């Protein structure tokens, strides 16, 4: 049950613009570092391993804490958590740009991950509270433009800003956007859930989740260097499995769990969240394809980012189309169509054995299908997850959904990068890129199957 103050307030364009601007602080600005790794190596006078940690740690920490932040948004207020997230982004951005110390770069990126963890579930909950029916679907479309669209633009945006203005301007602009978002959201009535206000926060669950995900991330990113038979690898694997098992047991017994597994009794919510995890995992495509054309074809970072222009254009256009398809066809068909089109695009981008000109053409067309598919999928998937969450748990439900987004992206990039490196060392860079991109296509196929089996034609909105 919501606080009475929200009953007299209806979401407007001012609030929606503020929400979208807060969302792109992560999906556009923070994620844009994927295309400026060599520049950061020179600027901070450090090795690629340190820079890769800084690049990936934002999505990882966002994924680890987003569910807990969703619970805090329900308990203490969604407007409050959104504002805290925006302020954290400003702080993180300042730490990144004020010096050339690698440690401050990593700390700043970590804080940006916490910022995204606060912003994503809180803003989805605000949309659930203050927008109804078609207005909510429209608001979710623009929210998706901020997230999916931001992720589509980030590669080109990062390369362009770094080349034309210098990489620090990425975060200077992020600070400016954050201040505008704070101004636009100011004055919005607070919205929170009364039903869980007296419950204790699940610290044990959060600690176990962090231990599990950090162990798993190290296994993926450093596993080939450690060796599967090494003591450290086996120890980390045991920690990951043990913490996961203990997490499941404790969460099922907890009165106010970090992850409420009762939410997954709804097949539509489960299908939307699982497919969302996998389709965010195909973010590994950008890392692999960008690295391949730079190392294999000799392209610059700006040229590499330019190949994905069709992706960013199509994802921005098709998100609103996905909204219209949602209104006319329901959730399932657009989600299936979008995923199917994405798989076709992924396969085209994987044709690294072709001559350069033919591959570039396939890449441009492939990115077009990639953006087309994600754009169609985005709004129906988000609407399915939010519509199938009870109002008093919408913050937690949104947190789990966006946890799937962040962790899907983090582990998709890690897995794709690991496969690319291992296969390239065993064979050559062309085969390595192709196999890594096939991995991404496989995640798309699995997502298609999950949607087909779990998302009903007519969603039951009661859990």
Swiss-Prot record:
Membrane topology designation: Multi-pass membrane protein
Protein species of origin: Staphylococcus aureus (strain MW2)
Similarity comment text for this entry: Belongs to the major facilitator superfamily. TCR/Tet family.
Reported function: Multidrug efflux pump that acts independently of NorA and is one of the factors that confers resistance against diverse quinolones and chemical compounds. Can facilitate bacterial survival in vivo when overexpressed in an abscess and may contribute to the relative resistance of staphylococcal abscesses to antimicrobial therapy.
TM region(s), chain numbering: 17-37, 53-73, 86-106, 107-127, 142-162, 165-185, 201-221, 230-250, 273-293, 299-319, 334-354, 357-377, 403-423, 435-455
Induction: Transcription is highly induced in abscesses. Up-regulated by MgrA. Down-regulated during stationary-phase.
Subcellular location: Cell membrane
Pfam families: MFS_1
Top-level taxon of origin: Bacteria
GO-annotated biological processes: response to antibiotic
GO cellular component terms, A-Z: plasma membrane
Protein name listed in UniProt: Quinolone resistance protein NorB
PROSITE patterns xrefs: MFS
SUPFAM superfamilies: MFS general substrate transporter
Location, primary (coarse class): membrane
GO function terms (MF aspect): transmembrane transporter activity
Keyword field: Antibiotic resistance, Cell membrane, Membrane, Transmembrane, Transmembrane helix, Transport, Virulence
Gene: norB
